[in-house]
Amino acid sequence: MAEATNQVAVANGHENEDNNDHLIQSSDPQHPANLIPEMCRKFYTWGWVTGTGGGTSIRHGDHIFIAPSGVQKELIQPENMFVMQFPTPKYPPSERKYIRKPKNLKPSDCTPLFLTAFERGAGCCIHTHSQWAVLVTLLVEREYGKEGYFEISNIEQIKGIPKGKGKGMHNYHDTLRIPIIENTPFEEDLTEGLERAINANPDTYAVLVRRHGIYVWGDTPAKAKTQCESLDWLFQLAVEMHKLGLPWDINKTK
């Protein structure tokens, strides 16, 4: 375990004198450099970021903090954070404005997808490889085809998901609809599909990726986290309901 920890907690690079290390040094537990590692540790215990998968990013003023790619998420430390200037170009990658890069770590493959959420006003974006998210994408495809949405109604927990910017939260009787996009061989190639899904569903705060996972965002880290929790609970419930032959969306059966 010590060797694995060292793999993640490597020394920072020094392309300039201090590599802007002051950006990730804070005693405040809510500072993004401290909060992202704490969130990733929780997500690991929930099975959301197993095997280095998934990621988390927080926008803090005109800075974006991003966990590195290809590392064990439960071992991430504040010094492992990448920091970008915001706004910043999504493409080409060489034009992205990194103002802090830890040595020997790779920028997240999720970066352009996180930027897509931030361009729409999000304060935090979470990407998980939840098994429940993957399963509901497969069930929707089998029952409704590749154009189908995940839809569920008359379940108390949908009240934890916003209806859209400034529109309040879903009510118990509402139908929650989450769009699903197709997976791609490389994470960054999901960006176009994510953008299309958001443009077609401007009120959504989440997009499922078939056979892959989900992207969830919120106005703040706390809102993104609780929305992701609510959705994952609903996905697990939906899988169990399907086993029992119970409909997800009662509004469709009326």
Curated annotation (Swiss-Prot):
Residues where substrate binds: 110
Cofactor(s) demanded: Zn(2+)
Reactions mediated catalytically: 5-(methylsulfanyl)-D-ribulose 1-phosphate = 5-methylsulfanyl-2,3-dioxopentyl phosphate + H2O
Location (main, coarse): cytoplasm
Residues annotated to bind Zn(2+): 127, 129, 212
EC numbers on record: 4.2.1.109
Molecular functions (GO terms): methylthioribulose 1-phosphate dehydratase activity; zinc ion binding
Subcellular location: Cytoplasm
Pathway: Amino-acid biosynthesis; L-methionine biosynthesis via salvage pathway; L-methionine from S-methyl-5-thio-alpha-D-ribose 1-phosphate: step 2/6
Residues the record marks as active site: 156 (proton donor/acceptor)
Cytoplasm in keyword set: yes
Gene3D superfamilies per UniProt: Class II aldolase/adducin N-terminal domain
Keywords, sorted A to Z: Amino-acid biosynthesis, Cytoplasm, Lyase, Metal-binding, Methionine biosynthesis, Zinc
Cofactor annotation comment: Binds 1 zinc ion per subunit.
GO biological process: L-methionine salvage from methylthioadenosine
Cited SUPFAM superfamilies: AraD/HMP-PK domain-like
One of the record's GO cellular component terms: cytoplasm
One Pfam family this sequence matches: Aldolase_II
Biological function: Catalyzes the dehydration of methylthioribulose-1-phosphate (MTRu-1-P) into 2,3-diketo-5-methylthiopentyl-1-phosphate (DK-MTP-1-P).
Family assignment from sequence similarity: Belongs to the aldolase class II family. MtnB subfamily.
Annotated protein name in UniProt: Methylthioribulose-1-phosphate dehydratase
Provenance organism: Talaromyces marneffei (strain ATCC 18224 / CBS 334.59 / QM 7333)
